[in-house]
Amino acid sequence: MKQGLHPEYHHDAVVKCACGNTFTTGSTNAELKVDVCSKCHPFYTGKQKILDTGGRIEKFMKKYNLNQK
């Protein structure tokens, strides 16, 4: 096998989020900067917004005079 082919692996790579959260993981980069992490992502924080598309369907039905059966 060729020597020096693979990049150096860092077992204690630091991940820094835009929200200020930091944690360590393994990576070929010594430091990673991310925009979203599990501490600030809406899915994990419970601040997820649910979009209601029912109003759009009703508007379409009314516009084209379609009756639901």
UniProtKB/Swiss-Prot annotation:
Keyword terms: Metal-binding, Ribonucleoprotein, Ribosomal protein, RNA-binding, rRNA-binding, Zinc
Originating species: Clostridium novyi (strain NT)
Cofactor note: Binds 1 zinc ion per subunit.
Top-rank lineage group of the source organism: Bacteria
PANTHER family: 50S RIBOSOMAL PROTEIN L31, CHLOROPLASTIC, LARGE RIBOSOMAL SUBUNIT PROTEIN BL31C
One Gene Ontology term, aspect cellular component: ribonucleoprotein complex
Cofactors that this protein relies on: Zn(2+)
Job of this protein: Binds the 23S rRNA.
Binding of Zn(2+), residues: 17, 19, 37, 40
Subunit structure as annotated in this protein's UniProt entry: Part of the 50S ribosomal subunit.
GO MF terms held by the record: metal ion binding; rRNA binding; structural constituent of ribosome
InterPro entries: Ribosomal_bL28/bL31-like_sf, Ribosomal_bL31, Ribosomal_bL31_A, Ribosomal_bL31_sf
Protein's name according to its UniProt entry: Large ribosomal subunit protein bL31
HAMAP family with a match to the protein in the record: Ribosomal_bL31_1
GO process annotations (BP): translation
Family: Belongs to the bacterial ribosomal protein bL31 family. Type A subfamily.
